[in-house]
């Protein structure tokens, strides 16, 4: 190895000494990424103080320490001389290298290694492999014989850099959420999440993103925009009408050229260096779905094959995507779990722990909207909320302009903009009528603007760039659209491992697991009632809102117990539940607002159903995928879609009517009756309602793989095929003589007649009881024998029936890590275990204020307190019998007065009590069965 003597230091790539050994004795401090004021503001926004990260010198191999607080002054990268004991004296250095080190002056222990051109205060410590000049100033500080190790011939470069990267990996922590990163550029990009800054903006729809890759993915939706063309199928008439028709046609052509020119305009700003993707289309041969990349096609084809190539090495669970496997593997890792000191709940990340601790303290960062005063816990939520105000302001001006009547537009004088537009279109203003002049003026104002204005529909749907080709519904993300398409295709990728039932969404499967496990994790804090679904708990809490108002809760407790205060009126409450109920009185929150009429709703499902009212017949008859076909048959409708936002469809139609042009946007489509407005574009079937059309389109989308062996017709499901096969059979000749019901087969008729004749062929040999089916008899025999033949392999518990064993085994599927040390009973959550341990400890924490009786659970004391409530004395004066229901009490009194309030519905006979009525109804039943048996016997003799 050649060594150059001089004053330039040792280059990093030659590493004449063991650089890993050198880093083991250094101390690193992170660079400052923003000033002290921004850091203090970010730390103050946290619900609690962030954990301090300090790596001990004796325990950590890289000896890195992160300062708990930052200053505005940039830190220096200081080098400390390693002790002589850390290097082996047996290792001998190279002679040439030794001479070179002897020529270098020794460095001090506080010498900085950053040069003058490196902006450390802005970027922090960057990656060593891409910024090697950081190590050019390293100098020798100890004698060479003690510092340099012997050269290892078997050590390769790749292994050396891999070890180096392991030592300095993830040394850039975020001071807000404590998340760490490998490179400072990744930390700078991550800080945009906390600041809420979104610097990358789409110049087509105005949507903003915080990462350039998200913007590139978003721009693909604008790549394949179709241009509408105008076909002149009607000959122009004479006079003024001909001039107006020529103006409309010329305007449409000019609009198309302007739209094409605006699409080819060079982008500016942050998007100037963003290339559009040039990938070709790739089509799936099974469902004809088109993808931009071939890798996306391969990933999509796994849905059809059902293959799951990625499996977990711990639990052997398989997945069809690598990202899903990576997300699942984190659930098995316990190395990074942090625990809450209050409730003991564990988390994999510190950021999740900080969010969880805010639920105990009751405090959260307050980001308020300046327009409406609404507050949010995260800056991203505030930015999304502000977009609602921006869309509302953008919609007000175009809507006012659209409401201008046509008569006032025609009366407007000819402006300079109108004359310039007429000269652009090659039309003389003096030779056209007022209707054509109005249209020219609108077009002139369109060209006079510096940029094309968006119509109100585009502004309203600016955040919904992914539209469904079946029902036309828009979504803001491509993943949401893919999940929505499962409704039309019938795809259900999520399957229950217990019963095999399939679901479209993963959270539907999670909710379905409650049916098997019978787990009820959602508990009411007031009465202790538990529920399996959060929606059930929300509906249950509405009962307490009526029974326990806020004044009742505040009047029975001392002031020191009222820890939750209202920020609006200052009233205090004992818990967050009563505080939330009180805040609803202030704001009456209905967060879901209709963009068209402004109506508010409390649930998003109600808003979705409400939006169907505003959909016009033209939008429902022709989905978005068919807009290009419809535009080819419209001469005036093209002007309506490319004209400025203040040119309404009524004005264009009036101008065309003045010119004598028949502007029928649906002239190439068959006329649909007024009663059935919505027609299918595939088969032509018509429907009265739009939902009927959407439901009908499932027939064309679902794959039909089951064929009838008689006529060859295909079906999607086995049940549909079974119903179809019965149409090929003869009529139902097997009729029940008692009730007249008809059956396809004689076996079905015989099984049905057992209900009338009470024929029970399967009888018990011990008690003589008869049953309709054999498995009923097998279940009944367990009562006499007491045999429990079904045994659980996990806990050795035995059961009498197989269904009971299957239901018991489902409890072992769900993890129950919380075990009681006294009785061994297991629980899923720690809160349930703590509540259970009160029984062993004898702690009855709930005491009745009236009688002093104590209870273990809050549900027990609530049930007990009902006995203290004042109730009417419903006691019979004759027999001293007590009743809870006034209805039964009044009927009971009639029996002592000689009345017969209980009547038979068949014959009208009345009885004084229910026992006599039940015996009488049983007599009617036996009469019907005897008549049916006699009728069957008579048919057998014939």
UniProtKB/Swiss-Prot annotation:
Keywords: DNA-binding, Metal-binding, Nucleus, Repeat, Transcription, Transcription regulation, Zinc, Zinc-finger. It holds the Pfam family zf-C2H2. InterPro entries: Znf_C2H2_sf, Znf_C2H2_type. Gene3D superfamilies: Classic Zinc Finger. Residues 66-106 are annotated as: Disordered. Residues 96-106 have a biased composition (Polar residues). It is found in: Nucleus. SUPFAM superfamilies: beta-beta-alpha zinc fingers. One of its GO terms (molecular function) is zinc ion binding. A zinc finger (C2H2-type) spans 172-194, 200-222, 282-304, 310-332, 338-360, 367-389, 466-488, 494-516, 522-544, 564-586, 592-614, 678-700, 706-728, 734-756, 762-784, 790-812, 818-840, 846-868, 874-896, 902-924. One of its GO terms (cellular component) is nucleus. Belongs to the krueppel C2H2-type zinc-finger protein family. May be involved in transcriptional regulation. This is Zinc finger protein 865. It comes from Xenopus tropicalis (Western clawed frog). The gene is znf865.
